[in-house]
Amino acid sequence: MINEPFVPKFEKEEKPEKKSIYIYNTHQSETYSDGTTTYEIGMELAKMLEEEGYYVYFQTGNFLREAEEEGLKYNQLYTISRRHINDTFAEHGGFDLVIDLHRDSAPRSASILESDGVTYAKMMFVVGMKSSNAAHVMEHSRQLTDKINQVMPGIMRSVFQRQSVYNQDMAENMVLLELGTDQNSTEEVRHSLRILVEALTNGGIE
């Protein structure tokens, strides 16, 4: 279920001096072990980054409902997100970072990092190698992986390459982040959110 959305403060006429971030979820209904969705976690990430002083645009709407109304299947949701990305870029211009936030499916043993009594959800960037921007996205994903691992060593899995596009042809600074898996709890994901925000705040966004 998709709850009431976080309403971003980013307006077209307020083109910011500070860094701007666009967050959306192609698969908004992906859930963690206790039922929280990636859409809800995306809203939390947006709020956290806004509190750090970034301009954040969080993509609202219900992609799955739109797909159903148009007779599209779940595996065609990238068609829906692409349309929203186009509209957002047209309305707001470019962003310093674009994040498509997902969660992966993996065994529990590959999903967690334990450090000082805290359990974190592991994270991973995915690069669509069929995208015309694959080289740029790969470099950016590797740099972010290193930056996040500097904050919490071992929290990042290696960048994963797939023979797909994931709409990454639309911007060189667009990344697909798998934040945890279906085996992670919301608490574990929130621990990782704090690491992600710290890394982005301390030089993770060029």
Predicted features along the sequence, with ranges:
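Active-site-adjacent substrate-binding region
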Residues: 133-160
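Catalytic-core regions of hydrolytic enzymes
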Residues: 34-112
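Extracytoplasmic/secreted envelope proteins and their assembly/folding machinery
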Residues: 42-46, 79-86, 138-145, 190-193, ...
